[in-house]
């Protein structure tokens, strides 16, 4: 052991200087460029912990966790907790869902404060015709209606996993499904970015109170990316990472795709063993996926890429998710050993407390990283590692994305700790070599291997204030030093695990005697390489292997000093044989060929007591990917916390008084010398240096004491950094993975005198201009793991001081070394006298949001004690004036106003000029005259006695004999005039004749008119016809008349015979067919009737109204009250004269207007009085439609349709009122529609909603009462009962309504749906929809959406019953 320490002391410091420079350059470059990754918003973090009601974890695609949403799930948060107020101009939405319902549903929605408008959202429609639609909502500020920016038709997604992405870029929206673009649509939007109001909300699985279908099923991914190209890049990275046959797209049901390994920044409490917690995976960045190469490597070329990359995180303590992996690619190579030889080595992971992960036999060991944090918690940015292990065998090639393992917190991801671990015991996602592959350590030939990259955050440099850059991760690139070769043809699952050592140290205050106080540092663990020996056994090519022997245990020794060092975390590499080995922690002697190097840490003792609290960390920078979690319940007041770190950017206070000078700390004791390393082989020859100046020849000097250690020999091939440098040790080096006990300081020897200048050397040969060929490869040397005591950070660069642990015995004189870096920081001095308190600084900036709590954080770590209720705050100030509201509905027509006051009497006008007016219209016909006398055939005239009910005759048939009345007789042959007969005596009463046929009213009117005089100007006197009647043409047969009263028959005595007439035609013949009517003949003689004439019967019923007459439109009413009461009976344009006041009015559209009359013209005193007023002075009203003639005396409410179909801009209330008035319905009718001011269920008066039936215009019952329509069944009615319009047409059959659909804009309970009522019935936009009900369904409230451009049926409801007295 002493020998090794002495050899280590000869380690040249210039090698460490180069490492420091490289690490410093990488860190500075990383800090300058930053790690600004693209912004992505994971919407599943809104679910929070504990899970809300109806939300649970479920096994998702690929066996990874997902969230299951039930019907009652309601996940919503204020949008500002996750979404930036100004949204991305271009973006993409990545989705992985499994719906379990054909109804689809809303995946997410960002709404306004009232949950009426969706600003941004994604929805799956219900299944229709074997297809579904993916709908993207994109509504710009200022709109009051949700806008469907893009709609894509996709196959049915129900009951299967679906992965798709929607990208918005410029004016185009594209849909990608399974990494293939399905379709692309254009949409118009303004140049302004999409902004969200502060009170906006975001919902997952629903859209709040929008009334849209909720999503039921599983959601595994729901992420918004700020770069719309991200889905394509992820797909390309996935394809490039595939190998062999799995080189491109694979069905989701075949290969589980792990898009990203996720480590959460908060861990469960520390326990001896914690089972792995599954967390939902998210997609990795393109840079990470692009590191996996899908290109095949020629067989026989082993490849193991191990690398560590440091990051300068944009902030510390921000709760960002760590997406860091270590990749180890194991490629097929030539077998190095025979089957069963036992020299396959496993790279094991151990920690500083002795935990190890090994495998024996054919066990499958999952790759793990064991992390423990101090006091049971892990700070943000703690080291995290994972590894890929890949074989390029075409048949057994695993998907690299399936080989990612993660570790989080201080819990231990299970590792295999005994030799009989089963192959299927590794957790999901653990890397596993395929059968016929083993991992061995051996020579890798002359091939150079491609380095890979691992990303590891480091909790380091927390107290470094000089550099000004918060560094929480480290980047170091190593060339391959571990070769995994195929050594066996039988199936053996072996993994290689590599983890860099991360040593976190904290000083405890004053220095001690045993070790210098150091600031927290980080050193990457460097790997060692080993080769199989000739005998096939795996040995380390170091002196340590030779001394300790195969499988030997490390010697026991005193415990390490811990007074000034907090518990360290380190992971070392241990070579362990893959087969036939003993239990973990060491090998029995002679049990195998695998030697253990650096196995001081294989045994782990029981957990120690919790360490002291760590020092405060450096304030983190503002986060970019950290979002506020859901608001928790107020907790109880906690105990006063310890003083926090200094707030950022505070104003400097006044300088305090200078403290006393602290005492200088003592110098630490010198550590023991390390073992001497072997001299390395010469490396490549360097370029010649510039010639030196000629010096004087000096005398030989006296030999001085041994000088300081010289530099190492020429570098050979080894652990290159891929930056143009080669690094190799010169001998056996011990793994410096733990602090060592400092030994006593030995005094330095006397300094030698300066030697004389040597003689001038000969000029060397000119070197070539290019680098020479590489020299022969040297034997691989061990790579040291640098302890944290080797590194001090000052001003952002690595500096190395004299390290006793590396000092060995003096080596040969070397060439002068390179200029050294500044020395290490001195030990911390004693605390000075406290100064006077400074002035109070200004209030610090607002802290950053806390970390998101996800499903893997135990509940007991989150809950706090319930806080006391706070006092009520004072009322806030008056808010700003809101925007103007919507224009209100048109109000109902007001009642007629009271008559205005009489105006002042006007001035007397000039006398008008009297002009003869036009001739008046013909007067009405005079009353009919009494029946005339009856003349028999022989000319006897029988006087008719006067009857009291008959009026006097208006004329006589024969001049001079007013008693004669002639009647038309049957036309006979023309005869000669006979002599008038003498007056006969009154005859006896004849027998009663049979009843006559009924008389048509039209024929009766014609008969009466024929009795009137032809000159109607003389209304009361007819003109003599000179006893001659010209017979008109015979009329058409009339309808039978009513039965008249019994008439009186008067038969006089037979008169004297008259003059014989001309002989008639001889003989009798059969009557012929009546001929057509002939032309009118000349006037014939007076008719000679042989029988009495029946008197007219009583007046018949009134006939149908005739055409409008030419009567005067002036109507006389008694007074003003009479005029107002009968306003509905007077048509527009009618003149009204009031008898009591003599005023004159005209009926206009909205009421009455008074007319100014001129000067009174008196009537002469001798003028006869005016005729009496007609008994029916009003303008005849059109008859009611027969459909309105039903008996409405019982209390009912009528449901009537408008006379025409109407689109979305209706003004329906006004039309209902207007058309009801025109139809003679005097009660108030309202539209059967919901509005933005009133729900449909409240249109009818509350007192009449239950007791009155709803009927059509014929009184047929449609609904039992108003409330029965809104019971929730859609308002079912009997489709055999028609619904009539105001003009009496059946809307269910009349072609004037081509679409038998009724607008309503309500849900089944009559509540308005603000997104389904055509913007309060004010628009006919094709893109806007409203709810309507097809009457064919037998429902009046069916929930079907129709474009507001459709012209559909609008119903009107009588909102209250009005009796006849009210009418």
Curated annotation (Swiss-Prot):
Glycans are attached at residues 243, 247, 305, 323, 341, 348, 375, 402, 673, 730, 792, 795, 799. Prolines at the third position of the tripeptide repeating unit (G-X-Y) are hydroxylated in some or all of the chains. One of its GO terms (cellular component) is extracellular space. Keywords: Cell adhesion, Collagen, Disulfide bond, Extracellular matrix, Glycoprotein, Hydroxylation, Proteoglycan, Repeat, Secreted, Signal. Residues 434-446, 751-765 have a biased composition (Basic and acidic residues). Residues 853-863 are annotated as: Nonhelical region 4 (NC4). Residues 229-604 are annotated as: Nonhelical region 1 (NC1). Residues 267-319, 396-446, 529-784, 905-930, 974-1000, 1055-1089 are annotated as: Disordered. Residues 555-564, 606-616, 703-717, 916-930, 1055-1086 have a biased composition (Pro residues). It holds the Pfam family Laminin_G_3. Residues 808-852 are annotated as: Triple-helical region 3 (COL3). It is found in: Secreted, Extracellular space, Extracellular matrix; Secreted. Residues 605-718 are annotated as: Triple-helical region 1 (COL1). Residues 1097-1111 are annotated as: Triple-helical region 7 (COL7). Residues 54-249 form the Laminin G-like domain. Residues 749-783 are annotated as: Triple-helical region 2 (COL2). Gene3D superfamilies: 2.60.120.200, 3.40.1620.70, Mannose-Binding Protein A, subunit A. Residues 864-934 are annotated as: Triple-helical region 4 (COL4). Residues 969-998 are annotated as: Triple-helical region 5 (COL5). Residues 737-750 have a biased composition (Low complexity). Residues 935-968 are annotated as: Nonhelical region 5 (NC5). Trimer; disulfide-linked. Structural protein that stabilizes microvessels and muscle cells, both in heart and in skeletal muscle. This is Collagen alpha-1(XV) chain. It comes from Mus musculus (Mouse). The lineage of its organism: Eukaryota, Metazoa, Chordata, Craniata, Vertebrata.
């Amino acid at each position: 052991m002493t020998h090794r320490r002495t050899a280590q002391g000869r380690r040249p410091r210039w090698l460490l200087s180069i490492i420091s420079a490289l690490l410093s350059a990488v860190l500075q470059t990383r800090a300058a460029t930053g790690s600004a990754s693209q912004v992505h918003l994971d919407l599943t973090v809104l679910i929070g912990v504990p899970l809300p009601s109806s939300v649970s974890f479920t096994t998702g695609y690929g066996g990874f966790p997902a969230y299951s949403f039930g019907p009652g799930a309601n996940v919503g948060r204020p949008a500002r907790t996750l979404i930036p107020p100004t949204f991305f101009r271009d973006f993409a939405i990545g989705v992985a869902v499994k719906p379990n319902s054909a109804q689809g549903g809303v995946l997410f929605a960002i709404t306004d404060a009232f949950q009426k408008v969706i600003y941004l959202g994604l929805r799956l429609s219900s299944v229709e015709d074997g297809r579904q639609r993916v709908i993207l909502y994109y509504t710009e500020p200022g709109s009051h209606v949700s806008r469907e920016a893009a709609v894509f038709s996709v196959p049915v997604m129900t009951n299967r996993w679906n992965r798709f992405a929607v990208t918005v870029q410029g004016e185009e929206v594209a849909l990608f499904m399974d990494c293939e673009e399905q379709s692309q649509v254009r949409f118009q939007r303004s140049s302004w970015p999409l902004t969200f109001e502060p009170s906006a909300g975001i919902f997952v699985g629903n859209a709040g109170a929008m009334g849209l279908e909720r999503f039921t099923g599983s959601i595994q991914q729901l992420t918004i990316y700020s770069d719309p190209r991200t889905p394509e890049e992820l797909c390309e990275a996935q394809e490039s990472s595939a190998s062999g046959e799995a080189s491109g797209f694979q069905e989701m049901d075949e290969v589980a795709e792990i898009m990203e390994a996720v480590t959460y920044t908060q861990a469960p409490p520390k326990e001896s063993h914690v089972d792995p917690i599954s967390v939902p995976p998210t997609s990795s960045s393109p840079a990470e996926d692009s590191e996996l190469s899908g290109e095949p490597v020629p067989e026989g070329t082993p490849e193991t890429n191990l690398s560590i990359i440091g990051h300068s995180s944009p902030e510390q303590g921000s709760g960002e998710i760590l997406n860091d992996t270590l990749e180890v690619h194991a490629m097929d190579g030539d077998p190095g050993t025979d089957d069963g030889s036992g020299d396959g080595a496993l790279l094991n992971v151990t920690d500083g407390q002795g935990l190890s992960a090994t495998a024996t036999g054919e066990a499958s060991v999952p790759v793990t990283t064991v992390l423990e944090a101090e006091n049971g918690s892990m700070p943000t940015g703690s080291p995290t590692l994972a590894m890929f292990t890949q074989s390029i065998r075409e048949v057994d090639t695993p998907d690299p994305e399936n080989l990612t393992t993660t570790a989080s917190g201080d819990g231990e991801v299970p590792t295999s700790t005994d030799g009989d671990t089963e192959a299927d015991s590794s957790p999901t996602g653990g890397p596993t070599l395929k059968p016929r592959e083993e991992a061995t350590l051996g020579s890798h030939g002359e091939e150079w291997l491609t380095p890979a990259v691992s990303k590891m955050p480091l909790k380091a440099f927390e107290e470094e204030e000089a550099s000004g850059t918060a560094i929480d991760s480290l980047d170091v690139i190593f060339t391959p030093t571990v070769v995994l070769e195929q050594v066996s043809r039988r199936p053996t699952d072996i993994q290689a695990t590599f983890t860099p050592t991360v040593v976190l140290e904290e000083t405890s205050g004053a220095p001690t005697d045993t070790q210098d106080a150091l600031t927290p540092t980080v050193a990457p663990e460097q790997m060692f390489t080993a080769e199989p020996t000739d005998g096939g056994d795996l040995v380390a090519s170091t002196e340590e292997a030779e001394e300790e022997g195969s499988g030997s245990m490390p010697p026991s020794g005193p415990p390490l000093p811990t007074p000034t060092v907090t518990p360290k975390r380190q992971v070392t590499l241990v070579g362990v044989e893959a087969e036939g080995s003993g239990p973990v922690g060491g090998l029995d002697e002679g049990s195998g060929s695998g030697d253990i190097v650096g196995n001081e840490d294989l045994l782990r003792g029981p957990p120690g007591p919790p360490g002291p609290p760590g020092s405060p960390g450096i304030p983190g920078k503002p986060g970019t990917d950290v979002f506020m979690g859901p608001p928790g319940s107020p907790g109880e007041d906690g105990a006063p916390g310890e003083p926090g770190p200094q707030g950022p950017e505070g104003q400097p206070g006044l300088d305090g008084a200078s403290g006393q000078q602290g005492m200088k700390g003592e110098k630490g004791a010198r550590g023991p010398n390390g073992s001497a390393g072997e001299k390395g082989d010469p490396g490549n020859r360097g370029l010649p240096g510039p010639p030196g100046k000629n010096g004087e020849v000096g005398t030989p000097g006296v030999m001085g004491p041994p000088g300081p250690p010289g530099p190492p020999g020429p570098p050979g091939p080894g652990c290159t950094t891929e930056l143009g440098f080669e690094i190799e040790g010169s001998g056996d080096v011990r793994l410096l993975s733990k602090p060592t006990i400092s030994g006593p300081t030995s005094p330095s020897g006397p300094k030698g005198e300066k030697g004389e200048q040597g003689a001038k050397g000969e000029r060397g040969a000119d070197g070539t201009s290019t680098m020479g060929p590489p020299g022969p490869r040297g034997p691989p040397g061990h790579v040291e793991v640098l302890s944290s005591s080797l590194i001090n950070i000052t001003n952002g660069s690595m500096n190395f001081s004299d390290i006793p642990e590396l000092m060995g015995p003096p080596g040969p004189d070397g060439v002068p070394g390179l200029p050294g870096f500044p020395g290490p920081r001195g030990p911390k001095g004693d605390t000075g006298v406290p100064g006077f308190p400074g002035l109070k600084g200004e209030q610090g900036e607002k802290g950053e949001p806390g970390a998101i709590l996800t499903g893997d954080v135990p509940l007991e770590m989150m809950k706090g004690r319930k806080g006391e209720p706070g006092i009520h705050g004072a009322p806030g100030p008056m808010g700003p004036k809101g925007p103007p509201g919507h224009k209100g509905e048109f109000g109902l027509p007001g009642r007629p106003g009271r008559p205005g006051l009489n105006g002042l009497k006007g001035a007397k006008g000039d006398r008008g000029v009297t002009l003869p007016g036009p001739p008046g219209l013909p007067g009405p016909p005079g009353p009919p005259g009494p029946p005339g006398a009856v003349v028999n055939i022989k000319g006897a005239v029988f006087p008719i006695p006067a009857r009291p009910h008959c009026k006097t005759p208006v004329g006589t048939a024969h001049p001079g004999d007013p008693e004669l009345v002639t009647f038309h007789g049957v036309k006979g042959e023309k005869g000669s005039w006979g002599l008038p007969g003498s007056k006969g005596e009154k005859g006896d009463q004849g027998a009663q004749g049979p009843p006559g046929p009924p008389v048509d009213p039209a024929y009766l009117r014609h008969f009466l008119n024929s009795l009137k005089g032809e000159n109607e100007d003389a209304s009361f006197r007819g003109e003599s016809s000179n006893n001659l009647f010209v017979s008109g043409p015979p009329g058409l047969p009339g309808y039978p008349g009513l039965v008249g009263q019994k008439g009186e028959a008067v038969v006089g005595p037979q008169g004297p015979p008259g003059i014989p007439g001309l002989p008639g035609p001889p003989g009798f013949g059969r009557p012929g067919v009546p001929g057509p009517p002939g032309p009118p003949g000349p006037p014939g003689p007076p008719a000679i009737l042989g029988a009495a004439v029946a008197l007219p019967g009583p007046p018949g019923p009134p006939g149908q109204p005739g055409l409008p007459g030419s009567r005067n439109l002036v109507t006389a009413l008694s007074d003003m009250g009479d005029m107002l009461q009968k306003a509905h009976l007077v048509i527009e344009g009618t003149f009204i004269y009031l008898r009591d006041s003599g005023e004159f009015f005209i009926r206009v559209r909205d009421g009455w207007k008074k007319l100014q009359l001129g000067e009174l013209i008196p009537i002469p005193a001798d003028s006869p009085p005016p005729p009496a007023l007609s008994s029916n002075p009003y303008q005849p009203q059109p008859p009611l439609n027969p459909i309105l003639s039903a008996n409405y005396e019982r209390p009912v409410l009528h449901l009537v349709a408008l006379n025409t179909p109407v689109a979305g801009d209706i003004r329906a209330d006004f039309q209902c009122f207007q058309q009801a008035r025109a139809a003679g319905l005097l009660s108030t009718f309202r539209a059967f529609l919901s509005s933005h001011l009133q729900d449909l269920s409240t249109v009818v008066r509350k007192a009449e909603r239950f007791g009155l039936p709803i009927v059509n215009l014929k009184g047929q019952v449609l609904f039992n009462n108003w409330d029965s329509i809104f019971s929730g069944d859609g308002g079912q009615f009997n489709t055999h009962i028609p619904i009539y319009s105001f003009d009496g047409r059946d809307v269910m059959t009349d072609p004037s309504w081509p679409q038998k659909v009724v607008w309503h804009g309500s849900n089944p309970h009559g509540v308005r749906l603000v997104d389904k009522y055509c913007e309060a019935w004010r628009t006919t936009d094709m893109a806007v929809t409203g709810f309507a009900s097809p009457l064919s369904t037998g429902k009046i409230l069916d929930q079907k959406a129709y474009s507001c451009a459709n012209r559909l049926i609008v119903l009107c409801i009588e909102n209250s019953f009005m009796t006849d007295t009210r009418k």
